């Protein structure tokens, strides 16, 4: 069997990967999507082709011999997007790290290098495979040289393989005659002119009959059609030049040796480190852990598995100033802990023998208590004030010269809230949460792992990731099979939490987010922990009854839809529904896709007012989702105590909003009555009621304050109906004569402006023309002139700094503002306009939550904060405490921020969430 060489067209495959994948970036903001896609294509092709040799060819910026022949060669090509351009040196660096032979040649294109190497290898008796997205390379196909062309159809990439015979079958000409076709028809991609009036069909007929442009020219008078004959007569010199431009040079003077091209071990340590830097976690699984960890496992860890040693270890930790802690848990079970006394003394404490879960968690709890106690004593001794409540003020962790104090005792962890599930503490100043700090410093990341933190904040330190230590094993499986890896994992987490504290604190200070961290996010950990532990009670019988109501209505809708359709069909099948609506019933406005008609909500919503069947289908979908998500889905979420304990996430959204999962209680429907009724299943325990407090139009009030628009501020100060006021101003009608429709439209504009809505978006929301929507927005900005300047200023600030900030200093990076892609850039501008407003509103609700939680606790009340949904707080309130809790909610929510317009709170009470809302 012949040896094989795989030849890769570097720029072509990189380009395909760039446009075929989402725009990926790593935590440093470096674009990586094209490199990631290239590597996946490369590795997959190697697995399929199994070559002995590999070479990747790239173009250079310098002009080639073709530019000397024709100055306008490739002159119509658009410049390479900057996001792609910056990845070219990156892929070359990666290939070099993998030991891949990379070849370039000044004056020649990658095609010429590939053609030369293909012919050279064929002459040596080898098989050659060329991978490229460029069909020009088909001219190189022979029985020994195969061209592989990736082709994307309906989002899926397949590969077309061409030897000489496949070229003939597809194009009716031999591979060398591909050049003749280009000579006649030209190539718009490369700006090869060809001859006027001859397209692919005519060119193919001519070459099939005459074989070459020279032979066709010799039989000029016989050429058909007439237009082609006259064009050949007048432009034969252009055809000859086009042929020369299209011909791939197969004897380029390049330096090449098969020794350098020999395919060796691609998974080198250098490649591993680069993959880590670029955050290609899926690719890291391909590397041999033992080989790549030689230089990364520098840290020495100790195991403490006896009671006496454990006592001594915790005594030492309590005597010290700072400790890093990690707890290894799964499904509520504790397997062990990592404890870093400093950056050299790091211990793993397994739960075994006399060291029980209760003992270990008790020692960690004691450590936190000791830290709190010590800090309190130091504060009293130094006669300093307690931490100030106002997030806009300086705090006691800062010296007068602006530097941070590090003399305070502290326990550091990657996720303090996860720690609090197993130990009790209520002192935010006793802990440092590296995960929350990392989120504040870069809120665009989807996860915050210890190895990422080490790389970013510990001078590029490379630590093995969890996957490298444990693979895909569960903690329990690792406990049984990979005890050493589990110990290392626990120690690395504890070490990273401790080591990252100082650089992260400095970064928070330098970015102006120290107060956001200490005054908002750090206390919030304890607030959310309390909410998760309390949970919210669910009435199972009511939930069952709700599900039955939904089932009845869904059944009624099903029959109505079938009756209107004239037949039974699967309403949950978009394909079947599309045929019924747009073919059988002949509804206008159908949008055909490759798989059938689109039945997306935005399509159907436009048709609903005119067609009752569509209105019924939309209701059917909404109710079916309600049933599966809530009526059925919530049943499995009810714990043994009869309550649902949702998880509240503070490190997910880029704007700073809190989200909830397992289950998501923030998406409880509010627009339709049957959706709102789900709130009836959430009830307080006996002797309690729900108090629900909701900020009124908080984002519009924030907009008024931040923009300083006098007219909007005055409207709020006069307690006017803000939407009616806007309608009156925008539509030039007296306040008392504003119609309901005008008020609804003004409301859409008011809230749309907050979210940076475009005229197109507003036209879709209001079912009006884009021109009308643009006029509404223009009139709005004429009414409130400072808002336009404020929003434009935010976009400019985002472009200049790369981020925008909330009123309290929270940053929101916006890399999209620098994108060469118009859609991405437009998205970035909308983000720049709405993030400071949304983010400030999110900060305010968090401050309010912290204040309410602390007041309830400090005043020893039985009532507790159990839920937060956007701008709404729900308190499970002891009936005897209703007046006191109402006053606390009113005072703390209104006092959470000082705005030029007063914050307003709507408050209701009820025996279930539905009644309270």
Feature locations, PLM:
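Conserved catalytic core of nucleic-acid polymerases
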Residues: 476-479, 533, 641, 645-646, ...
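Extended two-metal-dependent nuclease catalytic cores across DNA- and RNA-processing enzymes
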Residues: 2, 22-26, 75-254
